[in-house]
UniProtKB/Swiss-Prot annotation:
Bias kind Basic and acidic residues: ranges: 16-25
Coarse class of the protein's main subcellular location: cytoplasm
One example GO MF annotation: ATP-dependent protein folding chaperone
Domain of life (superkingdom): Eukaryota
Lineage: Eukaryota, Fungi, Dikarya, Ascomycota, Saccharomycotina
Keywords (A to Z) from UniProt: ATP-binding, Chaperone, Cytoplasm, Nucleotide-binding
Keyword set includes Chaperone: yes
A Pfam family per the record: Cpn60_TCP1
Protein localization: Cytoplasm
Organism, as annotated: Debaryomyces hansenii (strain ATCC 36239 / CBS 767 / BCRC 21394 / JCM 1990 / NBRC 0083 / IGC 2968) (Yeast)
GO cellular component: chaperonin-containing T-complex
Protein name: T-complex protein 1 subunit delta
GO biological process entries: chaperone mediated protein folding independent of cofactor
InterPro entries attached to this UniProt entry: Chap_CCT_delta, Chaperone_TCP-1, Chaperonin_TCP-1_CS, Cpn60/GroEL/TCP-1, GroEL-like_apical_dom_sf, GROEL-like_equatorial_sf, TCP-1-like_intermed_sf, TCP-1_chaperonin
């Protein structure tokens, strides 16, 4: 009886013995991730194409920045979402190489699929990939050229290489020095990192990209309030940043006040004047002469009567400061936000040599220059100009990438040749080391090495070159000791890209290979997909 029960029950355990399901899940995950990788492959390099994206709101984005494209793509498959996340991680870590990391991940997944078809266990593949990635980072450091932050020319060349694949590439002679100067100004010499939040990018429609400028200090897009005849320039400014309203108080509940005669009306107006005059006198008493007022969604941040009093007291007023600007302004000017008039004291004010409103390329901006307080972090503002919003948005993304490249060089002061040279060199080293290994690991190293060649292959394809001829030529050159041989778009073939000033930080390439191998490891270790209730 017992035997017959076991015999009957045994087919129900077939699910647990189904060996094909994990393989199908892995293939599905690899296919989805590679589809995303192939979608942005044409965007790589100086001859890469742009993508036009229409968002849910109907907004149009034109970009060839990998992180931006993937962020706005409607990616639904969870494994494909991992590729979006790895591109975002590269954007945070290095700022550049976001397209490369997605393409590398797709290529490594293709290599992993070949190994899985040979019957090699996924854990063994992922662990060997991890070791190969660690060795790749070592090879990249060995072939890199150490630089000093005093060598401004090298920094500018690296920033120019980053901009070469963007719409703004023809303006790189202006934007590259601008990116380098801004990072060096906000850099803390004690720490090997740069907080890019200290560099503020401001977009102004009007003019051309050539009119983009770097301002030492703070730039506000809000205009000075001139309706009451207040000043538009203040020297030796004492700046206050307030988060309360300069208008008569209103009750919390909705109610009506009924006025029966003119004496009551007169009394209300007198009290309103006295209330506002008292606040304005307190502001003047603290020696404040520039007032920044936070934007209010409930009621007017400042009314006409208060503006009249402030102009008579010779105080410059700038209203509608956005909530997300408060932290930057506090950091940049040394002023502390004031939420109540009773806390309005001189020690909460910031100081600057001059605050003035100027007209530039048909639009008005406010400059706060010469902030000299000891506890204030140095900040700079980059005013981007462009014919329309699409150009401005892409200019902002391009400058951000250039800033990140310079930040990478502050973290790791080493440059390598671009144009696929590092990937070919790493591939050559791993291929030669694979021959010394035994067993399955040899196959894995060889596949990893071949997968890295996707970068030079894609660069050649996007430049309209014969990828097989170019990559074969590069392999021969690297075998003969030419470590800096890469694809030169100018020469339409292989050449020494380091001598041609096609440079990139070593951190960009090492980070891309490490993150790509980690993403592949995560995908390979998934053998089932379960849906939660």
């Amino acid at each position: 009886m017992a035997q017959s029960q076991v015999g009957k029950g045994s087919p129900s355990n077939a699910t647990f013995r189904d060996k094909e399901k994990p393989q199908e899940v892995r293939k599905s995950n690899i296919l989805a991730a590679r589809a995303v990788s192939d979608a942005i492959r044409t965007s790589l390099g100086p001859k890469g194409m742009d993508k036009m994206i229409k968002t849910k709101n109907g907004e149009i984005i034109i970009s060839n920045d990998g992180a931006t494209i993937l962020k706005h793509m409607a990616v639904l498959h969870p494994a494909a979402r991992m590729l979006v996340d790895v591109s975002a991680a590269q954007d945070v870590e290095a700022g550049d190489g976001t397209t490369s990391v997605a393409i590398l991940t797709g290529s490594l997944l293709g290599a992993a699929e070949k190994l899985l078809n040979k019957g090699i266990h996924p854990t063994l593949i992922s662990e060997s990939f991890q070791r190969a990635a660690t060795r790749s980072a070592e090879v990249l450091l060995e072939m890199s050229h150490k630089i000093s932050l005093d060598d401004k020319e090298a920094l500018i060349r690296a920033a120019s290489t980053s901009l070469s694949s963007k719409i703004v590439s023809q303006h790189s002679s202006l934007l590259s020095p601008l990116a380098v100067n801004s990072v060096l100004k906000v850099m803390n010499e004690e720490h090997t990192n740069v907080d890019l939040n200290d560099i503020r990018l401001i977009k102004k429609v009007g003019g051309t990209i050539d009119e983009t400028e770097l301002v030492n200090g703070v730039v506000l897009t809000q205009n000075v309030v001139k309706t009451a005849g207040g000043p538009v320039r203040v020297d030796k400014a004492k700046i206050a940043l307030i988060q309360f309203q300069l208008s008569p108080p209103k009750p919390d509940m909705e109610n009506n006040v009924v006025v029966n005669d003119y004496r009551q009306m007169d009394k209300i107006l007198k009290e309103e004047r006295a209330y506002l005059l008292n606040i304005c006198k307190k502001i003047k008493k603290s020696k404040c002469n520039v007032l920044l007022i936070q934007k209010s969604i409930l009621r007017d941040a400042v009314n006409d009567l208060a503006l009249h009093f402030l102009s008579k007291l010779n105080i410059m007023v700038i209203k509608d400061i956005e909530r997300d600007e408060i932290e930057f302004l506090s950091k940049a000017t040394g002023c502390k936000p004031i939420a109540d008039i009773d806390n309005f004291t001189e020690d909460r004010l910031g100081s600057a040599d001059v605050v003035e409103e100027i007209e530039s390329s048909g639009s008005r901006i406010v400059k706060i220059d010469g902030v000299s307080a000891k506890n204030v972090k140095p900040t700079v503002s980059i005013v981007c100009r462009g014919a329309n919003q699409l150009v401005l948005d892409e200019t902002e993304r391009s400058i951000h990438d250039a800033l990140c490249v310079v930040r990478c060089l502050v973290k790791e002061k080493a440059l390598i040749a671009g144009g696929g040279a590092p990937e070919i060199e790493v591939s050559r080293v791993l291929m030669s080391e694979a021959n010394k290994l035994s067993g399955v690991e040899q196959f894995v190293y060889q596949e990893f090495a071949q997968a890295l060649e996707v970068i030079p292959t894609t660069l050649a394809e996007n430049a309209g070159l014969n990828s097989i001829n170019v990559v074969t030529d590069l392999r021969n050159r690297h075998a003969n000791g030419e470590k800096n041989a890469g694809i030169s778009v100018r020469r339409s073939g292989a050449s020494n890209t380091y001598d041609e000033h096609v440079l990139q930080p070593v951190l960009v390439s090492s980070s891309a290979i490490t993150l790509a191998s980690e993403c592949v490891k995560s995908i390979l270790r998934i053998d089932d997909i379960a849906f939660s209730r």
